[in-house]
Amino acid sequence: MAGEKNAVGSSKKKKYTGGVAKAYILSTFNNTIVNITDEKGNTLAWASAGVSGFKGTKKGTPFAAQMTAASVGRKVMGIGVKQIAIFIKGPGPGRETAIRGLQSSGLGITTIKDITPVPHDGCRPPKLRRV
């Protein structure tokens, strides 16, 4: 028929049967990215502040980080994830609010670990802004 199309992929969502999933939060001054993986590192769901509908300087706000984390949390709850271990990276303003967003979506948090890279006197930092 003219209105029907054959789907190439399967329309069924796969259920997550593993143990504790891992949530990686990258929080910079300009954006927040949340990625949820299984134990092997395969991505289950991800979102950023831009994907969540925020534009420009609003992407770097704590509210954008909370909404982004909550949307990813709802996605993986639909797949079947119940427990997550959080790995947070970066100095941005959305660090704590992203954790609260994941918690408010109904996910249980087992561990929180900060994996922000710290230089041992490596590269020279950029010059300070004068406004």
Swiss-Prot record:
Gene3D superfamilies: Ribosomal protein S11. One of its GO terms (molecular function) is rRNA binding. One of its GO terms (cellular component) is ribonucleoprotein complex. GO terms for biological process: translation. SUPFAM superfamilies: Translational machinery components (SSF53137). Pfam families: Ribosomal_S11 (PF00411). It comes from the Bacteria. Keywords: Ribonucleoprotein, Ribosomal protein, RNA-binding, rRNA-binding. InterPro entries: Ribosomal_uS11, Ribosomal_uS11_bac-type, Ribosomal_uS11_CS, Ribosomal_uS11_sf. Belongs to the universal ribosomal protein uS11 family. Part of the 30S ribosomal subunit. Interacts with proteins S7 and S18. Binds to IF-3. NCBIfam families: PRK05309.1, uS11_bact. Located on the platform of the 30S subunit, it bridges several disparate RNA helices of the 16S rRNA. Forms part of the Shine-Dalgarno cleft in the 70S ribosome. PANTHER family: 40S RIBOSOMAL PROTEIN S14/30S RIBOSOMAL PROTEIN S11. This is Small ribosomal subunit protein uS11. It comes from Endomicrobium trichonymphae. The gene is rpsK.
